[in-house]
Each structure stands twice: as structure tokens, then as C-alpha cells.
Swiss-Prot record:
PANTHER family: PROTEIN TIMELESS HOMOLOG, TIMEOUT/TIMELESS-2
Positions of the UniProt region annotated as Disordered: 573-600, 900-1150
Keywords recorded for this protein, A-Z: Cell cycle, DNA damage, DNA repair, DNA replication inhibitor, Meiosis, Nucleus
Positions with biased composition (Basic and acidic residues): 973-1000, 1009-1024, 1113-1140
Name listed for the protein in its UniProt record: Topoisomerase 1-associated factor 1
Principal location class: nucleus
Amino acid sequence: MENEEPVLSAPDVQVVDPDVRAHVYSLVTALGGFNGEDADKYVLGDDALACLRDIKRWLKLYDEKHNRMDVARCLGEANLVNGDLLPILAVWANSKKQTKYMSRIALACLELLVPLTWPVELHGELTINHHRHIPYIQHVHVSYKRGLLSHASTSYLRTIIRVGIPSMAIPRSERTTRDEGILKLLLYLLRNIALITPNTRLAAEGDEEETSRSATINAFQDQDVFALLLTMCSNVGDDFTMQDVALLEILFHLIRGVSVEKLFMDDAQRTAKRTDELDDLLRQESSLRREYAKNAPTRHGRFGTMIWVKRDDAKYSTVSGQNVLKDGQATLQKMDETKKWNKPLIRRKPQDLTVHNDFSTPVHLNSTASNNLRMFVEEFLDSGFNPLLTHVRKAIEREADRVMDINTRQFLYTTAWFLEAERARRARQRKKHAESEKPAKELEPDSFGLVAGVLNQETFVFLNRAMQYALDNKDWEDLNAGMRCFTQILLTVQDMAQSPLEEDQEIAENIQNRIFYEETTHDRVLAVIRGYKDQPFGYLDACTELTHVFLRMLERYSKENLDMQVRSRRRARRKAKDVEGTGNDENDEENGSEDEDRLEAERVSKERKFDFRRFAAKFCNQKCVDTFVAFTKHYKELNTEQLKRAHRYFYRIAFKQELSVLLFRLDIINLFYRMIKGPGALDSSKPIFKEWEEFVRQIIRRLTKRLDQRPALFVELLFSKINATTFYLEYGHERQTVTRARKAPAELEIDPRQAHTIEEKISIMVPALVLDGEEDLVTWVSDVLESAVEEREAWETQEKALRDAGAENSKIPNPMISVKARDDACQQAMFSNAKLRLLMTLVKFERLGAEDVPGAAWIIPSAPRAQDLREMKSFIDKYFEKAKRGTLGRDPRELIRRKYGGGKTASDNQHNPDIQFGDDSEGEDEVPDGPLFPPNPRAAPNPANKPTKKKKRKERNPDDEDEDDSVDEETLEERRRARLENSRARLAKIKSDLYVHASDEDTDEEGDKEFFLLEEQRRREQAKRIKHALLTGMTEDGDGSTNKKGQRKRQTTRNRTGEAKSKRQRRGKQADEVDEDDDVVMGNMDAPSPMSDREGTPSGEEDDGFNFDDDLVFSRDREKLLGSAGNEEKDSNRPDKAMAQDEDDDDAPIVAANRRRMRAGFVVDSDSE
């Protein structure tokens, strides 16, 4: 053995410590062996169980403790597994009498098999000892797997399962820690067997097929491993809770790299597929040979040729070969071929090599293994998919101890693979049913409930969090698995939307609402495609597929839902107040921490209308184009679906978004040209070739046209396009942008119930500005008032002097005082700070002009006297000092609110309901408050027959002439506004009887009974009248009179009935039109009184027979009103009164039934409903 060890540095180098080797070999020898008399029978040693435990102790205390692999190598050299452990298991399995001692030995063998087959991962913390032993350990693992899978005499896997069956049979509540450990060992051994693969860097021994994936799958099927996995997976959460992660790992290593498309093919389709693949490889090989033959040396080129080429810079270059004598172009081509590009090395962050978790490398299965795996996959989808993956997701979310970082990647890939398998199985079933000659019955649609465990909101949240974490930490393999999972979820939802079951269609609609509603999902897809740099091809394939599927489904969904809304989350920062260093160091530290808290970014959410064209334009940039160009460069290895994916993206860029200039770069044009014309062109027999050929022809045609129009594009062909010049290069002129004037902030007001006088309002506004950190603005307002007081006092003094001198024009005009901003920031705050504007309004500042635009001039009018201005300044200074001392009770900002919009009448509300929808533009999407219903009609407060008492006006004292009238005016104005506010608050609580009736109770059984009795009576009377008309040829008359007045009355009644009928038809049509629009909510409409229909319709037997649309449900409520309206009802029987009332009905608005508002598929319930 020692002579076979490689010599590393010197002949006397010892790979393993001789003492360790001697101890391990002695234990293996004492374990037992084959008897000389019966060479086929293994005989255990006298103390075999103790030997097995000692070997386990050596592995644990030497290798694991010292981070070495010496004992594992010695056991591999001693052939412990194939020479001792497996024969011992065979003896235990074939013995007729099962003893407790042999069961312990079998369990000890299982305890050794797990660490001996444990996979070896390469990472950055490997030592020299590891690098010395890892190749040998990997080689020995393959031999262990070969011995476990071979079952010429004994099915070792079935025997190992027998070791764990007693623990499985015990109920979960009665299992001990030992039972759980046995099940864990059993599953870990199966995981190791599925994971072990031959090392491609080691020399092949010719028997790799015995340890291939196909052999593993066939052995699992033959030795009942699949049955064990199905049993445990279907009972995860009930009988097995701690085994979910191990089961997930087994499934992952069984299916990783397996093509779902080939798995669900039958033998004929699989053979045809492999034939096509072989034909493609042969065609590529012949193409390479033809390209090589063009420049290959010939048998006649025996004499060498060397020439000098004089270049433009007077330098000479040497070129050899006879083919350079053809022409100058061939010479330059030869020079280019001799150039060598030293590609710079890319410094990457060292990452661990996850050899055993690579799912991008394809794995080929034979026919038997494909059939066995397909049967297992179908049974797993039917019984174990939902329980296992739901339980694993919950374990990963709560970060259970048994969960490793790699399990998230395995979960996402396994979910994606089985979702694709479910879609492939359904497609296969539909195809087989369509191809069957005699379909017995129509194929019953199957629900997607089998995979519903990964289509819920919890899974979407977990997937989004995992993808964002992988993107932030640049963990590309985890992000690759997340993108595959997200893509398969989208494709599964797409199939659900096309399902014949209405339940699946509704679920698919709801899932799409949830996915596309979050703008963070849109941004993440965009960041992934734009952030590609030099990741492996599997990552490139996943991100391009996700972009293709996401854009296609989002475009279709946005077309079907025109009022689609998305929730955007932006980062908003609250302005921190300036902290003045007036305190000690501790206070400074506290204030500094408060400022940091205020400066922390907050996520604010807002709904806005979605515009797909605007979103698709975000993918029209050079980074996204470079990603798809890097993907298209592998066009020789791409299949038809992948080529179609790249073609659709470039077509969207060039023709849908009209940004073909992004493709006008030399390397991109050269790539397109080589794909069609060669060398190494696409196979012209492929169906996608025609589409690519037409696309490249149109692109080159546009390029030549643009070059003729804009010669500057010749230079731009060498570089990537930037946003500043893209529009000009595409359209020949700069983008015409229209600057939109900034909108003034919403006008604020102070709650009239909390403040009535100017001082009370200033006591609210000044602390509010101080709390917002705007002390400088308060100081500025105080300074402006101070200067205004001085100027106004000077004018008043001058006016008094002129009046005392007895001048004729003693009253000179009081000049207005201009309000000047201190700096640009103050000027900006005068327009954008709503609280400052309210304070300025309170202290009698006024804005000049009707337009409220930035930079508008503010003045102090001539009405306020110096005394008034001084008083307001004193109020500001007083409450400014209180606010700085912090002696405030309630937060004054809570007393400030948006001001109600005035000037709107009821008619305006009727014809122009104030409805606002979200838009892509930034701004505040706030719906102004207002009463839900118009006020109830009130009786006249002063009837005409009741005399009113005149109020005695208080006589004014002539001594109070000097008192200013403006104060009384302000007090009255404040009281009027307080009354208006109380009225609005009262109206907001009113639900008018015009809209809410007693019949709104759905459980009124007496009303329903009365309604149906009246309907039955009307039908009987109608049947009698029809029968009488058929027998006699005449209709019944209510009164039987034949005079002209009665004829005119009946004629008028018929006309009125026809008009009423047509009126009802028009009303019904309008109501239907309103019902068709889900987004329009009609409010503030004056409805006709409940008596309007009866008042406009004459009473009589004829009308009782034909007016079927009378609202009989409300009859009980209306009977109360019949007594008071009896005179009016008598008058309404006259033709002129009836016609007049019909005309009034035409003008009355129609109140549509209140519908639940929906936005992008979500029901928005009002609080009052």
C-alpha cells in the first residue's frame, strides 16, 4: 500500500502517521473476515461491536477534532466498507433469526457508513492535509457507492432501510432521541449515495456507468428507496418533522441537471431528440472543418513565403504564407490573425466551489432510469409535494437549527424543477389524449391544487426576500435558483389562467394581482438584467428567461386590466431640525442621536397607475442590450426557444420601442451578420432562422439609412450609446421637453373648534414650525413685522402731524409694505411651505396677483395699523420662546389640517363628481374630504303664515368710535366658520333617508312574503284581462264611460304610460352603463323622493296591470306618507299635472346602485359601507 502512495517532496515523506495507520489496521483486522474453510461466508470477530465503536471513536476524536483525513484514508486503504461493513450487513439480512446483538452491529455499520461517505466540499480553509487526501477520498467514495448500489446477492439499500423501519413504526410522540437519530442516519446515507459522482479530474476506470445517476435511480426504484421517500414526504409535518431538510437534499441531488422535457418523452420521442442532437453536433463539426480547410496548409506549399508590409506610419511588418500574395485584403487579414490579445485577468472574490450543488450541468439518463424517475416524480407530485415543501419553507423562515445556508438554494431549485415537471406532465396528458384514436371520453380538467403549496402569499414573500438578499450579497448561484423558481411560478400561473376551471382562473388572476402589484418586483427584475457582468452561462440563461417571461406576462396582464395599479415604495427623508450647541456634551450626544434617527430613511408606499410602455422603456438601455448580446454570442449552442427569446427582445428594442440605435454598434452588427452569413452561421433549416434573417436585414437597412441621414453615427458605431445622445441619434433632433410649473402646496387651516382668535391660532402655528425645525422662518416673519411696525408708525405720525396742522389733504394714502425674503431658501419656503404660508396669512400678509407661482410677491396691505402689527409680533415672539423651552402640551401639528375646497355647489357635485385616479406622475394622490351624502331636505324655518320677530339691534356707544371695526368682523367670521365646520361634521355622519331605506335589510321575511303575494295577485288579474280581451276583442275599461272626456282621459293615460315606459327604459340603460364601469362611484346626487313614481303615475286598474316595475318592496314605508300626500295624489290624476310631473322626472338625476369599488382587481371597501 505504502509503495503506491505518491511522492510529494521527498522519498521519505509519510502521508499518514505510522502509529495511526497501525491502530486503524489492527481494528479492521480484529473486526472479522472471510473464513478459510468457507470463503463466501464472513465471520465476525470475538468483539466486533467494540471494534466498530472504536473505529467510530477514531473518526470522531482524531479526524474531526484535529481537522484531518488520516483515519478516513486508512479505512479506505483497508477496504473497510466493501470488505467488512457490507458483508456484515449481508450476514444480518440473510440470517433467519434476528438477534438484538446483530441488530446493534447493523446499526453500528450504518453509523460508520454515514461519515465514510460524507461528501467532501472544497473551500478556502482547506489545509495541506486536506489537499493531500481529497483526491484519494473522492476516488474511494465512488467505490463505496458502487458497492452499495450493486445487489447481486444482497440488496444493501433495502437492508439499510430495515435498520430504520422499527424507528419509523413508532408514533412521533413516542419516539426517543435515539429513534430520531437512526432516521437521520438513514436519510443522510441515502443523501450521500445520491450525491457521490465520479471526479472528472481523476483518471476514468471505465465503469462510471455503475455509479452514474441512472444506476442510482434504478437502484432506488428496485430496492424500495423511492417508496420510503414517498411515505416520509407525504407524512411530513404529521409523523416526520425533523427529516424534512434531509428529504429535500435527497430530492435535489436526484433531479439536479435532469432535463424535464426529455424526462416526459416516450422512447420514440427521446430517440428522435437524441438523433437530432447528434445530427447538430455532426453538422457543427463539419462546419468547423470547412472553416479550417479555407486557411489550412496544402501539400503544394513546400516553399515558404515571407513578405514585408509597409503600413501607414512608415513601419514594416512581416507576414508569412503564400496566401498573402493574393491581394492586399488577404494580407491585412493574415496580419489580424497573427495578433494575440492578452485578455486582462478579472479579480474575483474567492468563492467556495460548490461542486455537489451545481444544477446547471446537464445530466443524461437512460431509458429505464427516465421511466423510473418519471413515475416517482408523478407520485411525488400527487402526494408529497405540498407537505414537504411547505414544511421546509417554514423551517427556513424560522431559521431552524437543522437548516443550512445551502438549503435555500436547494429549496428554490427543487420547487422550480417540480413546477416545470407538473406543467410537462399536463402537456403530455393533453397530447396523449389528442393523439388517441378512440378517446373514450373528454379529458377531465385537473386542478392545480397539487402544487398550491408554493403558490401562496407566504411563498412569494419568502421568494422575494431570498432573491433580494442574494442580489445584495452577490450570491449568484442562490439568485440563479431564485430566478428559476420565479420563472416557473409565472409560467404555472399562466397555465392556470388558461385552465378550463373557473376556480383556477380566479386564483391565477389573484396571484398575478399580487405579483405585479409590487413595484419592488419590477425593479428587482430590472436590476438583475442590468447587473449582469461575467457570471456563468446558467445564470445568464436564467436572467434572460425571467426577463422574457415577466415582460410578456406583464404586457398581457396590463392590456387586460387597463386600470392596473402598482404600489411604489420610495425612500423619504424627514428633515432634521438644527441642533444648536447650547447644552453640555451629553445633551449634544443625545441630540446627535436624535438627528441620526430623523435622518434614517423611511419606506413610504403609494399607489399609482401602471404604464407598461414606460416600464418597458427601462429595459431599453445599453446594459440590458449587452446582457442579451452576451447571451446571443452562444447562438451555436442555443436551442430554438432560447434563440426566440433573444430575437423577441431585440425586436422589442428596435421596432416596438423605436430605439434601434442601441443596436448600432460594430460588435453587435458583426454578431448579427455572422449569425446569418457566417462564418459559423445558424443552421438555415431551423425554423427560427427565417425570423432572425428578416430581423438582421431590417436592422442593417435601418443602419444604412441612419448613416446617410446622420454621418455622426459613424463615430458612434464604435461606442455604447448614452442616454444623452440616444434620442438625437434615433430621431435626428433633441427631445422636446415641456417644463411643468410646480404646483402650490395644499392650503391648510387650523381646526376652528380648537382656536378662535388670532392669538390662539398663532400659538398653534409658531410651535408647529419650530417642531418642524423651521425656527429661522419664524424669526424671519418676526423681523418682517418689526420693520413693518416701524414703517407704519412713521406713516401714522406723519398723518397725525398733517391733520394737526390743518392741511387740506391731511389723509395721505397708506402705502403697502413689501415682504422681502431673506435668501433663496426663504423665497422657496414662501411658496412650498404650507405652514409658513398659513402663518403669513394669519399675520395679514397677502400675495399679489391671482397666480400662485414660485417667486410671487407678498405684501402687508394698508389696512392693519401699527398697533395690530406690533401685537401680532408680540404673539409670535411669546410663543416662539415657549416652543424653544419645550413647554408645550399637545402636539400643535395635530390641530392643523387641509382646508376644505370652497365654491362648489350641489349641481357641480352632481355633474362633476370629484374622483381622482392615481397616475405615473409624482405628487399627492389625496381625495378631498366631504360629506358622503347631500343634506336632508329641511322644512322652511319661517313659514309664510307665521310672523317673524325682528331682533333688536344693540345701540352702539358713540364713545367707542375709536375702536376698530375689523376686530368684530374677524370675530364674526370666525364664528361663521365654526358653525360651518360643525355643520360639515354633522353632515358627515348623516346617511340620508333618500339613500338608505328600511328595505335594505336582506332578512325581512314579512316584506318578502307581502311582495310575492302582491305579485301573484297581479299575475292572476293580468291573465283574466288577457283572456277577456281574446274572447271579446275589447279591453276592460276601469270606469266604462263613453263620453269624450273619458276618451281623452284614457288616451292621455295611454300616452303617459308609454312615456313612463320609455323613461324607465332610458333609466335602465343608464344604470347598465354605470354598472359596466367598475371605477366610477357616483356621489352627491340629489335623488327623487320615494313618492315620485307614484305621484307621476295615475292610479287605476289599467296601470296596476301594466306597471310591473313599481317598487313594491318599499310599500310599507310609503304608506306612512300617503296620508300627508293625499291631496297631491288626487291632483296628480289630472292629465296636465301628470305630464308636468313626468317632465320633472326627466330632470331628476338617476341614482345608480352603490357598487364596490375595485382597483386593479382589489376591492376597496369604504369605511361607511
